[in-house]
């Protein structure tokens, strides 16, 4: 099918070309600018200016040409050429606050629904990490400033702390310089299938982010040139995602030394960047960032440190047909929770990550081949992760075992006081490679087809020592004391037991442009992506379109499918060890003996049947350009299905029945007296999670009030979310003698909605380089409702055979009162509108020095509300 389409395009096409030449000049001093990157916005053909600022670019069509000009330190410029204009002179201005127009908010692109944040928008919030920048987007809110827990983000959803939210965060893709940032190989979890939450964290702050997306704290903003956010339908070029795409472009090129320091509460940050131009064809940029953040300025108990460094080298040949960029970076992140002298039982946590990445981006315009361009991207990422938790235990004596074999074993008697130590060591390694070709064709009717064909390959592997015991040989043991308990015993597990996860993909895209006689314009991107993710094959069509009716109205629409592969931590969890104390527990005769026996049951643990989660995304929009404002309105419906979900299913094993023999002061022993059924809950991961997000968002940019030098903009977002699962819930019968062993219930569905607005007021005086920005946030609606299912649909008997209960009998207390649960439906909402206001004052001086003061919640608003239990709650937006 692809070959037929390709031949049809060729047969109806003519190779119309137009050569554009020109010169690029620095507006400040009228000197020529070399190394400026020139890109055709439709075909992605490109060129680079020479030492005299001159350039030449071949355009494979004749009319409606728009060229983009960009270089580090200058304001990016788009210039539309007249149909008879083949030579242009371009003036680029310094990107400072002395520009006549400064954009400090997310800019809605005129093609589809993507949002772009430039340098000024990135600096608008004095960001300490990428998380601070993305909070400016519609539907997001600024929460308490806290760098002592991992940060992720989800777009276009009202779900917060839920399994669906974790799925969506895991499915949000971050791509830096055309290289995806992967979290698939992160396995820093103590017991992936145990149900134990927050393996490494303290006081509600979770450090590790397995299965929950990229930790945005690790990405500093000092070296970022531009951020593009696609909340709708991504290009077919991008895969392994379900919930959104963030494209990051870093700085490369000549620039002066830039030293910056930021201080906020007990957080301080220091940045150094410099760009060097060795000659006409070679330039280098390097930067280093250090951040130190304490949870409390009065002590150093909870602390986060980050050190990032990067070196970028860019080369181009003399005739500007090859552009190659090599990026290397190193990183160190440390979460450190030290011992609290006032709390001997407090956990001591250390979570450390050190690593490096190297990538190469090659752009080549071959002269003697049929294609216009060939792009090759490759990368390698290597990290060493170490997580450790120390906790002082003061409990009654207990028994444990470290055996890795089934059967009855003599237990280790754990003293009532000891230090429990849990450690996980990982070495995540990821690679990525993509090869892409481009070709632009036009036909006699001036239809422009920009064709893209590419293949990609990515791998994820972890070669760490894994979960292991440290010192004292009695660490983090969990022992069952009764039947039915789902707690799992801890055992060593090497991550080398996991296999390499691979993804092989190919994609094709036809980007169509047509301008009609009456100024109507059609943009249509037709793409398809083929993914092979660990043997799971999927075909993902994606469509984006826009139709400009006139200078006032433009329609937009798009739809597409995408998928996200499971992580290694979800696939490879290790065997589950169920430890059952036999007899009456620990047998003690003071001064003579202390004995206990544990029966160990082993069940396979890996979730190798887990498949990629998938998403179906649609959106439709309307852009209106009025004399006083530009309005962008977008409605969307997104569905996540085959999402990752935990499941607990009752199982039983027939095991030997042991009888303990105790005779006076003699050492106790046991005899096998038959068999018995042992019931327990088996934990696993399945593809049974689903979620639907329906919403509408708008962005309005008002015309500048020139008499006041005031720019005003606003955005609003409403989202309705429904989370649901196909995983049944099981609960033991309240009657030990009944034939019904477990009740079977529907899962708890969640319904949420959220309505937020934000206003931006920017007062700008270019002559003195002064900018005063006021950003307001308003939460008008935030509701959460969790539906309960107290009445069983059926039950499992002693053989765990399912029996359906007739609908009319499910509420019958006489028959099934021992299975009916008493659990109220939970619902929460904010009774009043919550407000937050942030102020920034920035000044650029002529000597290159700049200063900025940024205050969040500068009016010190303290919005309280009361929950369903009449507890007074302080909203998290009070930063």
Residue ranges and their predicted role:
Residues 637-639, 657-788:
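Gram-negative outer-membrane beta-barrel transporters
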Residues 406-411, 415-521, 693, 742-747, ...:
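Outer-membrane beta-barrel transmembrane domain signature of Gram-negative proteins
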Residues 134-200:
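Extracytoplasmic beta-strand/coil segments of soluble accessory domains associated
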Residues 39-41, 45-52, 101-128, 150-154, ...:
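N-terminal periplasmic "start-of-domain" segments of outer-membrane beta-barrel proteins
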Residues 25-29, 39, 68-74, 84-123:
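Short, acidic, small-residue-rich periplasmic hinge/interaction motif at the N-terminus
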Residues 179-230:
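Short acidic/polar hinge/loop motifs at secondary-structure boundaries
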Residues 87-91, 130-133, 152-154, 175, ...:
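N-terminal periplasmic accessory domains that precede
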Residues 640-642, 778-802, 806-819, 832-833, ...:
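C-terminal beta-signal and adjacent terminal beta-strands/loops
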């Amino acid at each position: 099918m692809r070959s037929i389409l390709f031949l049809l395009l060729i047969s109806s096409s003519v190779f119309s070309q137009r050569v554009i030449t020109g010169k690029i000049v620095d507006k400040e001093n009228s000197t020529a600018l070399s190394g400026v990157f020139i890109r055709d916005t439709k075909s992605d053909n490109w060129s680079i200016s020479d030492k005299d600022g001159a350039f030449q670019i071949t355009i494979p069509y004749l009319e409606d040409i728009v060229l983009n000009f960009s270089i580090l330190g200058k304001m990016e410029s788009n210039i539309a050429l007249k149909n008879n204009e083949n030579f242009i002179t371009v003036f680029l201005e310094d990107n400072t606050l002395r520009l006549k127009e400064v954009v400090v908010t997310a800019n809605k692109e005129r093609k589809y629904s993507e949002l772009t944040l430039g340098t000024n928008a990135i600096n608008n919030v004095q960001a300490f990490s990428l998380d601070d920048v993305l909070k400016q987007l519609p539907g997001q809110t600024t929460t308490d400033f806290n760098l002592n827990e991992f940060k992720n983000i989800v777009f276009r959803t009202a779900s917060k702390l839920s399994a669906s939210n974790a799925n969506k965060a895991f499915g949000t893709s971050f791509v830096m310089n055309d290289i995806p940032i992967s979290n698939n190989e992160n396995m820093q979890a103590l017991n992936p299938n145990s149900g134990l939450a927050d393996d490494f964290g303290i006081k509600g702050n979770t450090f590790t982010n397995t299965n929950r997306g990229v930790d945005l704290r690790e990405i500093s903003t000092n070296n970022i040139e531009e951020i593009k956010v696609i909340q709708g339908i991504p290009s077919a070029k991008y895969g392994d995602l379900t919930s959104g795409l963030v494209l990051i472009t870093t700085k490369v090129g000549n620039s002066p030394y830039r030293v910056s320091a930021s201080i906020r509460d007990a957080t301080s940050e220091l940045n150094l960047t410099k760009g060097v131009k060795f000659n006409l064809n070679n330039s280098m940029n390097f930067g280093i960032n250090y951040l130190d953040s304490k949870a409390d300025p009065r002590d150093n108990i909870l602390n986060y440190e980050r050190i990032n460094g990067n070196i970028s080298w860019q080369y181009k040949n003399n005739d500007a047909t090859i552009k190659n960029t090599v990026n290397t970076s190193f990183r160190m992140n440390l979460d450190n929770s030290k011992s609290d002298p006032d709390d001997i039982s407090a956990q001591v946590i250390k979570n450390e990550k050190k690593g490096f990445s190297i990538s190469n981006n090659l752009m080549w315009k071959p002269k003697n081949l049929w294609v216009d361009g060939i792009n090759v991207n490759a990368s390698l990422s290597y990290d060493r992760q170490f997580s450790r938790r120390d906790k002082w235990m003061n409990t009654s004596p207990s028994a444990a075992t470290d055996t890795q074999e089934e059967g009855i074993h003599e237990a280790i008697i754990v003293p009532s006081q000891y230090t429990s130590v849990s450690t996980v060591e990982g070495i995540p390694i990821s690679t990525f490679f993509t090869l892409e070709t481009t070709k632009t064709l036009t036909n006699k009717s001036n239809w422009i087809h920009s064709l893209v064909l590419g293949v990609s390959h990515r791998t994820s592997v972890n070669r760490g020592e894994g979960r292991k015991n440290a010192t004292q040989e009695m660490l983090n043991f969990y022992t069952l004391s009764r039947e039915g308990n789902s707690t799992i015993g801890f055992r060593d597990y090497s991550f080398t037991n996991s296999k390499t996860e691979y993804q092989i993909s190919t994609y094709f895209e036809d980007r169509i442009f047509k301008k009609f006689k009456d100024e109507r314009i059609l943009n249509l991107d037709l793409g398809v992506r083929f993914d092979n993710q660990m043997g799971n094959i999927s075909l993902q069509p994606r469509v984006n379109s826009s139709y400009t009716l006139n200078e006032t109205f433009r329609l937009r629409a798009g739809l597409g499918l995408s998928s996200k592969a499971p992580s290694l931590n979800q696939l490879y969890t290790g065997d589950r060890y169920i430890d059952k104390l036999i007899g009456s527990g620990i047998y003690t005769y003071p001064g003579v003996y202390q004995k206990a026996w544990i029966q160990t049951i082993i069940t396979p643990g890996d979730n190798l049947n887990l498949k990629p989660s998938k998403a179906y995304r649609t959106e439709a929009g309307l852009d209106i350009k009025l004399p006083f404002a530009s309005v962008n309105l977008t409605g969307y419906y997104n569905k996540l299905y085959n999402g990752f979900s935990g499941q607990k299913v009752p199982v039983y094993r027939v095991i030997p029945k042991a009888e303990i023999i105790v005779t006076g002061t003699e050492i106790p022993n046991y005899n096998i007296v038959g068999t018995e059924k042992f019931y327990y809950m088996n934990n696993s991961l399945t593809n049974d999670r689903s979620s639907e997000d329906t919403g509408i968002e708008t962005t309005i940019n008002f015309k500048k009030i020139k008499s006041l030098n005031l720019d005003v903009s606003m955005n609003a977002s409403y989202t309705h979310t429904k989370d649901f699962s196909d995983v049944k819930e099981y609960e033991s019968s309240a009657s030990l003698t009944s034939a019904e062993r477990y009740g079977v219930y529907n899962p708890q569905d969640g319904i949420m909605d959220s309505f937020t607005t934000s206003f931006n007021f920017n007062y700008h005086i270019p002559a003195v380089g002064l900018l005063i920005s006021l950003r307001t946030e308003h939460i008008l609606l935030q509701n959460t409702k969790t539906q309960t299912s107290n009445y069983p649909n059926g039950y499992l008997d002693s053989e765990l055979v399912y029996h359906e209960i007739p609908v009319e009998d499910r509420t019958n207390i006489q028959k099934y009162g021992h299975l009916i649960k008493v659990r109220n439906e939970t619902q929460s909402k904010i009774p009043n509108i919550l407000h937050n206001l942030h102020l920034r004052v920035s000044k650029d001086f002529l000597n290159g020095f700049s200063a900025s003061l940024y205050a969040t919640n500068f009016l010190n608003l303290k919005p309280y509300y009361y929950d369903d239990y009449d507890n007074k709650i302080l909203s998290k937006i009070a930063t």
